[in-house]
UniProtKB/Swiss-Prot annotation:
Disulfide bonds join C75-C90, C82-C95, C89-C110. GO terms for molecular function: sodium channel inhibitor activity; toxin activity. It comes from Trittame loki (Brush-footed trapdoor spider). Coiled coil: none annotated. Pfam families: Toxin_22. This is U16-barytoxin-Tl1f. Glycans are attached at N85.
Length: 116
């Protein structure tokens, strides 16, 4: 019973004097709010905006790098059908009508350009 009385009295004292710290906390909060709008705080914000700008630049560079590493479109090799319904011929080849099998398939083929 005596221990309960001691704990209850401590509880009452803690609640009574615990409110005194609340006023101190409110004063500290007011100081923090006032300090936020000073020049020091604005000077701290400038590097943050610079950091955000650098991150934006970095993201665009990474996108360009990802595009550069992407796979190129495939091209047709020699003796492969070409034309409007097919992909383009590789470099060094031209899309021409041939006498051989071109007439059978009714489409031009990728061939080496004739030198004549």
């Amino acid at each position: 019973m005596k221990t309960i009385i001691v704990f209850l009295s401590l509880l009452v004292l803690a609640t009574k004097f615990g409110d005194a710290n609340e006023g101190v906390n409110q004063e500290q909060m007011k100081e923090v709010i006032q300090n936020e709008f000073r020049e020091d705080f604005l000077n701290e914000m400038a590097p943050m905006s610079l950091l955000q700008q650098l991150e934006a630049i970095e993201s665009t560079l990474l996108e360009k790098e990802a595009d550069r590493n992407s796979r190129q479109k495939r091209c047709n090799g020699e003796n492969v059908p070409c034309g409007p319904n097919h992909s383009t011929c590789c470099s060094g080849l031209s899309c021409e009508e041939t006498f051989g099998y071109g007439w059978w398939y009714d489409t031009p083929f990728c061939v080496k350009p004739s030198k004549g």
